[in-house]
Amino acid sequence: MAHPPLEPIEALASATAQSLGFLMESVVLHSHRAPQALIVAVRKGDGSDVNLDDCASFSQAFGEALETGELLTGAYVLEITSPGLGDVLQQDRDFRSFRGFPVCVRQRDAKGGEIQREGTLLGRDADAVELNLRGRIQRIPRSDVLEVRLTSPSA
C-alpha cells in the first residue's frame, strides 16, 4: 500500500487538537501494517496531564475529521497517545517542558562511535544540549547529538 502524504494528516490533527485545547506532538503512520496504524501524540495546551477521557474525545473528533476528509484509504487503526517516559525529545517545546527531567543522550564520540550519557536536562539552545551530569554541567554540541530520550530517575 502506498504511503499517503503525512502533511495533510498532520495539519488536520493539529487543527483538531487546537480546537479541543490540545497541542499535537507527533503523527506517525505505519502503512506497512495490515491494517495500517495512525498514531497521534497530543498534550494539553495548559501543560496538565492527558488522561484517557482526553484521548477518547480527541480520537472521536479526529476520527470523524479523518473520515470526512478521506485522507486515508482502506482500513486503519487510530491510536491516540500522550508524550511521556521513554519518549524522544525533538521539538524546542519538548526541551522547555522537560527541563529538570532525567534524560539519556545518545551522541557521537570523537572516533565516530556512539556513547550514551544520563543526566538532568538543563536545556537546549542553537548550539548545544546542556546536561547536569552528577553535579557537573556539560554542553554537548547539537551536531553530535543523535537522540535525547526521557528516562526514569536513577536509584
From Swiss-Prot:
Keyword Cytoplasm on entry = yes
UniProt-listed GO biological process terms: ribosomal small subunit assembly; translation
SUPFAM superfamilies recorded: YhbC-like, C-terminal domain (SSF74942), YhbC-like, N-terminal domain (SSF75420)
The record's section on InterPro entries has: Ribosome_maturation_RimP (IPR003728), RimP_C_sf (IPR036847), RimP_N (IPR028989), RimP_N_sf (IPR035956)
Q: Where in the cell is it found?
A: Cytoplasm
UniProt keywords (A-Z) are: Cytoplasm, Ribosome biogenesis
| S-S pairs | none
GO CC term (a single one)? cytosol
Q: What is the documented function of this protein?
A: Required for maturation of 30S ribosomal subunits.
Give the family this protein belongs to, as stated in its UniProt record: Belongs to the RimP family.
Quote the protein name from its UniProt record: Ribosome maturation factor RimP
